[in-house]
Amino acid sequence: MRWLLDTNVLIDAFAGRSDTVRAITGARTATLEWIGYSAATRLEVLGFPGLTAADELGLRNLLAQFSEAPIDAAVIERAIEIRKSVRIKIPDALVAATALIYEAHLVTRNTVDFKNIHGIFVLDPATM
């Protein structure tokens, strides 16, 4: 199994939200083939206005524990297909497309944003 971590999950893990930390810690000790995040997620996490230098360093250290999935032509084309069929913001379309291309379960608290995307499997850390 593969997991793609959404922005809110990484932010929650950094903030120490217990259900998210428990889910990620459990996943890292399980037999997951891959745990990563989209390059769009890195932009969202680190591009936050007012981020302190200490928080940026902490977030970069957190991101370094996982693989980054690039936004390549295949991801962009899949995101275009998604946006043609579902009303969704561009970053979420890129994340969803990445999950589909990588055949990964999308781990997110924003399950509603992804519910109408065909073929995506969404996991909420609060219910794991």
Model regions and ranges:
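Acidic, PIN/NYN-like endoribonuclease modules and their adjacent C-terminal/linker elements
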Residues: M1, A96, L100-M128
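Generic structural signal for small/hydrophobic residues in well-ordered secondary structure
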Residues: D6-T7, V45, A79, A99, ...
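Alpha-helix capping/helix-boundary segments
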Residues: V9-L10, T41, V75, L94-V95, ...
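Short, structured coil segments at secondary-structure junctions
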Residues: L62-A64, I117-H118
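Short glycine/serine/threonine/alanine-rich loop segments
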Residues: K84, I88, A104
